[in-house]
């Protein structure tokens, strides 16, 4: 066994690099960590998030200190919100002695929903991503991305068929760059209200009849969904920029239908 000595251990990451090439993003990816996320009902949800954490690296340094990313994450075990997300990002940039940083936090988020007729309650899960970025030492930007599962029913199929119409589950993905607070639930409702019908975790027979007929009476192409969502986002002053996507997992094809609208309202 080697004896312990007081001699300093070499800091290889902090040594100079002679290639003179800066790195835009370096850090850790796909690390899981338990978090508390605030919900609109005044409570909080215990969940597990997957983090990607990066900083930029100047051309004159060989490497970054990977262990510090984990230390920063472990030091923030309290409730994570839009506001505290900025604090974590600034802490990372400061600790890693960088002027730019990027954090992505992806987690399942649950909403307790009531069935439309019976009122029976059940949970439905959504995939949410918080994205925070600091550029040039001070410029902070926050984006929230929510993937909302919905039902879409084809207008063409309804029009040309003597009875019935093909329908399928779809994903409406909304990414919003905000200037003030927006609840996750607010984004979910925007997507669900513009679909042919929303989804529920549990339905009784009267509920199933209702959602089937609602979708049939509200047919939407992917083009309709993204345009209808974009129209709502265009009139929401809390949102500076957005990307809205719709992907229909076609029930009569072995491919998806897809549409996207991207707008920066500041330009």
From Swiss-Prot:
Keywords: Hydrolase. Its EC number is 3.5.4.16. Converts GTP to 7,8-dihydroneopterin triphosphate. GO terms for molecular function: GTP cyclohydrolase I activity. Gene3D superfamilies: Urate Oxidase (3.10.270.10). Belongs to the GTP cyclohydrolase IV family. It comes from Nitrosomonas eutropha (strain DSM 101675 / C91 / Nm57). The record marks 154 as: May be catalytically important. Pathway: Cofactor biosynthesis; 7,8-dihydroneopterin triphosphate biosynthesis; 7,8-dihydroneopterin triphosphate from GTP: step 1/1. It comes from the Bacteria. This is GTP cyclohydrolase FolE2.
């Amino acid at each position: 066994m080697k004896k312990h000595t007081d001699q300093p251990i070499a800091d290889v990451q902090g040594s100079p690099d002679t290639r003179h090439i800066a790195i835009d993003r370096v850090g850790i990816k796909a690390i899981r960590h338990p978090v508390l996320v605030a919900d609109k009902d005044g409570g909080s949800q215990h969940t597990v998030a997957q983090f990607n954490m990066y900083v930029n690296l100047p051309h004159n340094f060989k490497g970054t200190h990977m262990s510090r990313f984990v230390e920063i994450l472990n030091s923030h075990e309290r409730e994570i919100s839009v506001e505290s997300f900025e604090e974590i990002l600034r802490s990372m940039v400061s600790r890693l002695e960088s002027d730019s940083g990027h954090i992505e936090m992806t987690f399942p988020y649950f909403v307790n929903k009531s069935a439309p007729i019976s009122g029976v309650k059940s949970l439905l899960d959504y995939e949410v991503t918080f994205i925070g970025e600091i550029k040039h030492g001070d410029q902070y930007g926050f984006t929230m991305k929510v993937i909302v599962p919905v039902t879409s029913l084809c207008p063409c199929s309804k029009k040309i068929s003597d009875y019935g119409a093909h329908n399928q589950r779809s994903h409406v993905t909304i990414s919003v760059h905000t200037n003030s607070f927006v609840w996750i639930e607010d984004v979910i409702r925007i997507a669900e209200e513009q679909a042919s019908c929303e989804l529920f975790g549990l339905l009784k027979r009267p509920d199933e009849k209702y959602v089937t007929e609602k979708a049939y009476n509200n047919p939407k192409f992917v083009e309709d969904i993204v345009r209808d969502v974009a129209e709502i986002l265009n009139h929401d002053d809390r949102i500076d920029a957005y990307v809205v996507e719709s992907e229909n997992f076609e029930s009569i094809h072995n491919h998806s239908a897809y549409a996207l609208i991207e707008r920066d309202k500041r330009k």
